[in-house]
Amino acid sequence: MTRVDTTLRLRYARYGEELRNSLHAVYGDETERVYDLVVRIINRAYRERSADLKALDEARLLQPDWLQLPERVGYVAYTDRFAGTLKGLEARVDYLSDLGVTYLHLMPLLEPRPDENDGGYAVMNYNKVRSDLGTMEDLSNLAAALRSRGIALVADLVLNHVAAEHEWAQKARAGEQHYRDYFWMFPDRTMPDKYEQHLPEIFPDFAPGNFTWDEQAKAWVWTTFNSYQWDVNWSNPNVFCEYLSIIFNLLNHGVEVIRLDAIAFIWKRLGTMCQGEEEVHHLTQALRTAIRIAAPGAAFKAEAIVGPEQLLPYLGKGEHWGKVSDLAYHNSFMVQLWSSLASRDTRLFENALRAFPAKPSNTTWGAYIRCHDDIGWAISDADAAHTGLSGPEHRRFLSQFYSGIYPGSFARGLVFQYNPVTDDRRISGSLASLAGLEIALEKGEADEIDLALRRITMLLTAVVGFSGVPLLYMGDEIGMLNDYTYADDPDHAADNRWVHRPVMDWDAADRARKDPSSPGGRIYAALQHVIGVRRSLPHMHASIESTVVPSPHQHLLILLRDHPQGRMVQVYNLSEHRTSLSAEVLRAHLGHSAWEALSGYDYNLDVHELTLEPYQALWFVAH
């Protein structure tokens, strides 16, 4: 028996039954037929996988916690806005490496429909890179260049829908029943109206409702997001097999992490919101198990921006514990950072984190402060009430504060998707503009500029210091501001999220790296330093959760990381005021002295109290 045969035999022995059971939970009597199809796809993918990628697989099998290591630091960018093309991005690998990046998420790479395309998420061809970015060969070359520098490439895969121009949709329109079965198509409004009774609207402003009449197809098509994005039917096993083949094609071109976009929506059940149904997790486990056989060095990241109780299943709950996605976004951490920054009060933050369910220890959070999307104020009424707040009133306050309407606000953001029925207002804006740098620079007041820079560096330090993989959004490391020229572009003018999707300012990046006293330089130098400190601390391993230490002062957030090699306590001042902290709080967890990792100083904790400067962060490590 050859080594290849032995490798596959051992992996099937380990994962074959799990794969079969996951498929059975969804496809029932069709399981054996589907399993045989899936095995053929797996075997073909394994044969086509390069020796270099197979070596990566073997290395990852020896270090299964590779995604949880302290040195894992993420960066998120649009290829065209960061470097023009995939080839152009190869020339920027040094920049990423110098910052400390080891995980690069490139926003939609695959060929979208030619017109309005939801920022690239209306994919027309999953097996072709956007022509303006390059080719699949360019993608492979970039992945290899990144891999040689220890940087894992992350790519999006939209699972819930395809563009109306996709080959499957075109064949469905032409009347081919095989492909009509790939979608949710109805001859009249009878079933759509029944489903609509329980479905929310994703884009109420410009895409109301969840179904669109298609004249060519002579059917009502399920279109959760936009009329040009057709929801696919995962109850059809042929759809599962199609997507598994797509995943392996990306992995065999060097992608190491697949971001499962809109994963929550892929299973439809009448009488529900059609989000997060149990079959979603069976399907994810089946996909993950399949890649464990042919490409075990790869991982899944769930794009599920939901509440805490709804989020845990995407990392694994019950029978799926630790067997679905490897990483998920900690949206609540991001929202609570912005909330506490506006209110100067961390009590709601404490309550929300304390109530957060524990994740499987082999999974990882993605922590972030900004991303390509808007900010939705995902603060539950229950968490707000527990803190003595009204949920609707607090969410309204945050929208007013970060759109600059609230008196005394330092922020400059834009309201996105106002829903008059729910009074929901989301916010667009860059980190620097929302944190006050834009207004401060306009005023030219040194004190306000200093406070804004302190806010930005504190927020970034909190993200780098939290559990999991910190995800830095392109340009935030140099304090890029809102880009209002989006309104001059007909393709972007109707979507103000483009205000925080600027073209990377490489002149500003060069200035920031050369002049650490400039505003951009202060942010870059501080972030680079914090990342370096993080890499040196075993306490930052993502298997360890950050837990709340009750703070005696509402301005301060105190987090404990209880690692086998010792304890770490992080303290963040989320206000512009000098704030005192009783040393007794620290002594209870660290003893009589501790090393502060960010400054490198030893602290005597037998004093009465410590004072934190405005927006200061302290990372204490027990001796």
List each language-model region with its residue ranges.
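Active-site and adjacent substrate-binding regions of carbohydrate-active enzymes
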Residues: 1-623
